[in-house]
């Protein structure tokens, strides 16, 4: 058998290119974390892997290998090979990887060669590539200056970032808009997948030779996605630019984001009746998540206003009443909290301005 190995020195190229990858690990391993360009076509499923692992601990490697062969043979073995062959037929440049680039990769490569197809496997496997990406995140702040984009809730920071080549959209990677109402219809990635996608975005950003790395001024947690500690610490000391927007535009933007887009998304996913129920639950649950910080009286006032707005929307198909609770939430909760947090970093502020002024300032940064 000819062993074709992709060395660790090519990790950078693998992630920059979005190299198609076959992840040979069991589904339970894949679900904890993998890479964006990978597909899970396991050598062993969860129960098979568990049995082999138990055997390895009790009887050693050779006994575990023998058990693995007895579990994956005949029709089952052929089904696994066919799945790999089908993927490789559509993606002939794909690489294989298992946890450490060991027995599972080698055995899969051997079976594929016996079927007439050569597929290289990645040295170090998942563990090696994962450690490489962790290193990318840890060293990224030293590669170029960080610039933090701040601005009141509803000022359009995400829309602004998406127009800038020197920016990375952390909320896009986390699939969460950062605030208590920031949940999206689709779930957030696992913590490992969030970190892996962030690292790959950083690698690609570094190719652009930009003057800075522009990021939204985020909390440590974006929904349930935690920014890596070293990266978050670097963000806390970064220079700040503040995006300014008129109140009426902020309110209109939040009405669109919290109400129109979320209602439409739930309705398209679940149908009109179930969609409206899920949308209502999203709003009320989001408000409930900040109940303690609002205090009982203000929470009750906002909840009553929200339920009245939902009733109007359901019965009259109008959303204007939502503006009342959004306005109160902004002016009594979000804005004071934002001003307090920004004041602590006032010495780091380099510039304040509108969307247009901010674009012009950054173009000359």
From Swiss-Prot:
Active-site residue numbers: 98
Reaction equations catalysed: 5-methylaminomethyl-2-thiouridine(34) in tRNA + selenophosphate + (2E)-geranyl diphosphate + H2O + H(+) = 5-methylaminomethyl-2-selenouridine(34) in tRNA + (2E)-thiogeraniol + phosphate + diphosphate; 5-methylaminomethyl-2-thiouridine(34) in tRNA + (2E)-geranyl diphosphate = 5-methylaminomethyl-S-(2E)-geranyl-thiouridine(34) in tRNA + diphosphate; 5-methylaminomethyl-S-(2E)-geranyl-thiouridine(34) in tRNA + selenophosphate + H(+) = 5-methylaminomethyl-2-(Se-phospho)selenouridine(34) in tRNA + (2E)-thiogeraniol; 5-methylaminomethyl-2-(Se-phospho)selenouridine(34) in tRNA + H2O = 5-methylaminomethyl-2-selenouridine(34) in tRNA + phosphate
Top-level taxon: Bacteria
Biological process, per Gene Ontology: tRNA wobble uridine modification
Transmembrane region(s): none
Annotated Rhodanese domain residues: 15-138
Known function: Involved in the post-transcriptional modification of the uridine at the wobble position (U34) of tRNA(Lys), tRNA(Glu) and tRNA(Gln). Catalyzes the conversion of 2-thiouridine (S2U-RNA) to 2-selenouridine (Se2U-RNA). Acts in a two-step process involving geranylation of 2-thiouridine (S2U) to S-geranyl-2-thiouridine (geS2U) and subsequent selenation of the latter derivative to 2-selenouridine (Se2U) in the tRNA chain.
Membership in a protein family: Belongs to the SelU family.
Official protein name in the record: tRNA 2-selenouridine synthase
Record lineage: Bacteria, Pseudomonadati, Pseudomonadota, Gammaproteobacteria, Alteromonadales
Gene that this polypeptide is encoded by: selU
